[in-house]
Structures are given as C-alpha cells and as structure tokens.
Amino acid sequence: MKKRALVSVSDKTGVVEFVKGLLEQGIEVISTGGTKKLLEENGLQVIGISEVTGFPEIMDGRVKTLHPNIHGGLLAVRDNETHVTQMNELGIEPIDFVVVNLYPFKETIAKPDVTFADAIENIDIGGPTMIRSAAKNHKFVSVIVDPVDYDIVLAELKENGEVAEETKRKLAAKVFRHTAAYDALISNYLTEQMGEESPETLTVTFEKKQDLRYGENPHQKATFYKAPFAATSSVAYAEQLHGKELSYNNINDADAALSIVKEFTEPAVVAVKHMNPCGVGVGTNIHEAYTRAYEADPVSIFGGIIAANREIDKATAEKLHEIFLEIVIAPSFSQEALEVLQSKKNLRLLTINIEKATSASKKLTSVQGGLLVQEEDTLSLDESTISIPTKREPSEQEWKDLKLAWKVVKHVKSNAIVLAKDDMTIGVGAGQMNRVGSAKIAITQAGEKAQGSALASDAFFPMPDTLEEAAKAGITAIIQPGGSIRDEDSIKVADTYGIAMVFTGVRHFKH
C-alpha cells in the first residue's frame, strides 16, 4: 500500500521542497487550504482533504481535519488485527506522515493592536489534535512540526526507505513540547486578559537560545532559554558584535549590570563582578561616567562586566582597552570604538536597547521542589513619600549622592550598604549576615573618601551600631527605609553627629 502524508502548515518555510522530496519517494500527499494551494501553484500533485473525509471544509476552515477518516488513519495500531479490521470495514486508510505546524498565536498576540477576537481566532484546534494523535502513535507515524527536521526525515527516507524508530520518538517528543508551549501561551494570554495574578496552576514556556559550555562551574551543564515575549532591553535579545560565546556567569553578570544601568537617565556606567556592582559612575558624558566607575574600585573592576547607557565613543573605548574585561554592554558603539575594542579577540561586545521597565514583570526563582514568583523590584524613589526625621536636612550635593546610592543599593545582595560621593560609588558592602558588617566593608573600601559621603542601606538599622560606624568614618548623610522599633536610637545618634537621615518607607532586600 502506498504511504500517505498529511501536510497542513502555517509556517511554509521549506514545505514545497519537502513535499517534492516526499513525492519523489512515492509518498501520496494530502493537504488543506492555503498549503494545498501553494503546493499546486508549484506544480505538485496533492489530494484535497475533502477527498479523504468526504466532507467539505466548513466554518471558515475551523472544521476540516476533525474526522474519523483522518484520526482513524493516524491512531490505528497497524499490527492490531481489530484496528486493521475496523479500518477495512470503514474504508479508513492509514496516514504515515503528518507535517503540521500551528496557527501563529504567538505572532498574533505580539501585535500591539491585536484584539481579543483576533487572538481567539488564532487558537488552533485541528492542528494540535492531529499532531497529538500522530505523536501518540509514533511507532507507525512520523510527525514533523519543525521545518528544521525536514532534511533529517528526507535523508532517512532516501537512505533506508523509512524513518528510524529513534527519530520518530524524538519527533514525537518535540510535538508534545510544541503543543505544551502553544497551550501555555494561550493559557497565559487568557489569564492576563482576565487579570488573574496568581492562578491555581502556572504554565510557563521558554525558547532555547543557546547551549552553554557549562554552568556556574565547569562540572555543571547549562542552557540559556529566552521568554517568548522578553523585553528587547534584555540580555536575551542582545546582539553580540564581537568576542567569545557568552558563558552562564557572563549572562548573569550582564543581566545584573543591565538592571542597574537602567536606573539612570543621565550618562552612566556600571561595573559588575559576581552580580554585585563594584563601581557606578555618572557624568556629563559616557567617558566621564566610565572614569568615575573605574575609580570607584580599580581593583575589582578587573575581569568585570561593564554596562553603559550611552554609545561608547573612541575615547571611552581606549580607556576600556587598558584593562581586562569580560563584556562591554551599550546601546551602540561608534565605528572608531569598535576598531579599538575588537583588537581584543575575547572581549564580548553587546548592544542592547537600554530602556527601564515601565511595569514590573514576573521574577521566577526555583527552590527545591517548587518555584517562587514575584514582581521585579522596579520601584523608584518617590520623594513625595519620604520623611526626614533628623534635625538636619541633606544639602543639594548630599541629595545627589543619596539618590545615586539608593538606586544602586537595591541591586546589591543583602545585607547591602552603598557609599556614594561626587557622582560615583566609593564603597559597596554586600551579602553580609549583619548590616554593620556590610557597612564596615563599604567604609574600609572607601577609605579617606568616606569623609563627607552619603550612605544607603537596603533595609532599616535594627541597632544604631551602623550609625556609629558611619559617624566615625565622617559620613554626613544616610538614606534607609526606616521602620525599626529602634529608629529613635538611630535618629539620636544621627543628630548627635549632625548626620542628615532620610526615611524612604521602602525596603529593597535582594537575595
């Protein structure tokens, strides 16, 4: 009996060549709607679906393959005598290949002007049903949902006259990944449309971007996946202009650097090591901002990741060229800057649209046996809600330094303390188990520069000991959430030393 293939695709990439290859192997091809029209326009002889079902395509194509003559031909177990007898009695012929991909639901809902009705109309019903039927019966049916697999199937047919069992299994697994991702997109769209923030089940889907050499350490395997609708201002959508392939740690660090530099509207440069900022500088131009970020910690910046929110010019590139860096991220690079930086063959250069998120996306964190979901911390300082409990208010320069430190501290691992002075960070204390420990690290790093600087704390001071350390170092202004039962103790210490202190009412823990 002649083998048969059913071909009905939304993505018509390579389908004409593939069907031509099937026909050359003596395989009969059944097709529907626009796919049939395309194949016939290219001189290929195919059978219309209505000839198989004995029933016309109806309801604007909503019902065309949902028929026993199709699904019987897909689901029949060929070595089951009962199935074969029933097929013969009912005139059902087997279908050996299914070539189907689904209505472009993702592309439809990505359109800015999409209506709910348009989205619903692009939910495929017949396609998923067919490929699931074929995948379930993959011992007898080869099912292809990805044009990437066309050449593999044709090569095996030409060499062996059939598709290998292992290949059929791989193709079947891809089908169920394909339909699961498709249904997840639909589920998420409808959930968002209904305004449900915490549904009883969470479905997520990500698309493979690249395999990585290894994970956080060489003994760990890793892969990079991107969200279907990730913001273009993300590492997932970065364009790499030069350098080695990104590593797992590179991606994490680049993401951290990008998150911080997005906080600034003025020219800014951020240097990151191990997902913590080691230097942040702002200025009237990007060269000045980089100089300050470098001077913030010229030791730790070595081997770091740099993110800038303005084009990298030649002068800045020449400064960057002087030290070893893993990555430089910017919205763009001048041609002269590229010529300078591309002389370092391993330096990775990424262009990314630097744009602060206007709404909080969801952050997913895996834990053993589960997943935590929360909104990203995109909250900026609201000066209308702050309070100043101390006798002295910050000066104009102190306010500038406090705001810079506050923008940075929320991106530092808790317990976090950041010192800033003259448009740059001068000390960062990260990840200590007690707040005063982080303060001591930041103060030690700042050295003499701590005199007259501003301090930001990601959470309140449970005791006045951090204030005491700040006062000894000559720090003159502090910004913190407030809210401790011992706030009065901290206020008294601040007033004793003439420190201006701001309460934001907002905590910025980061773990």
Swiss-Prot record:
Q: What is its EC number?
A: 2.1.2.3, 3.5.4.10
Q: In its keyword annotation, does this UniProt entry include Acetylation?
A: no
Keyword Transferase among record annotations: yes
Under the heading Pfam families, the entry gives: AICARFT_IMPCHas, MGS
Q: Name one GO cellular component term.
A: cytosol
List the pathway annotation.
Answer: Purine metabolism; IMP biosynthesis via de novo pathway; 5-formamido-1-(5-phospho-D-ribosyl)imidazole-4-carboxamide from 5-amino-1-(5-phospho-D-ribosyl)imidazole-4-carboxamide (10-formyl THF route): step 1/1; Purine metabolism; IMP biosynthesis via de novo pathway; IMP from 5-formamido-1-(5-phospho-D-ribosyl)imidazole-4-carboxamide: step 1/1
Start and end residues of each MGS-like domain: 1-145
**What's a single GO BP term from this record?**
'de novo' IMP biosynthetic process
Catalyses which reaction(s): (6R)-10-formyltetrahydrofolate + 5-amino-1-(5-phospho-beta-D-ribosyl)imidazole-4-carboxamide = 5-formamido-1-(5-phospho-D-ribosyl)imidazole-4-carboxamide + (6S)-5,6,7,8-tetrahydrofolate; IMP + H2O = 5-formamido-1-(5-phospho-D-ribosyl)imidazole-4-carboxamide
Q: Which UniProt keywords apply?
A: Hydrolase, Multifunctional enzyme, Purine biosynthesis, Transferase
> Which cysteines are disulphide-bonded?
none
Q: Which SUPFAM superfamilies match?
A: Cytidine deaminase-like (SSF53927), Methylglyoxal synthase-like (SSF52335)
Its domain of life reads Bacteria
Gene Ontology molecular functions: IMP cyclohydrolase activity; phosphoribosylaminoimidazolecarboxamide formyltransferase activity
- Alphabetized HAMAP family for the sequence: PurH (MF_00139)
Q: Which family does it belong to?
A: Belongs to the PurH family.
The record's note on its domains: The IMP cyclohydrolase activity resides in the N-terminal region.
* The protein's name in its UniProt record: Bifunctional purine biosynthesis protein PurH
Q: Which organism is it from?
A: Bacillus cereus (strain B4264)
Q: What is the lineage of its organism?
A: Bacteria, Bacillati, Bacillota, Bacilli, Bacillales
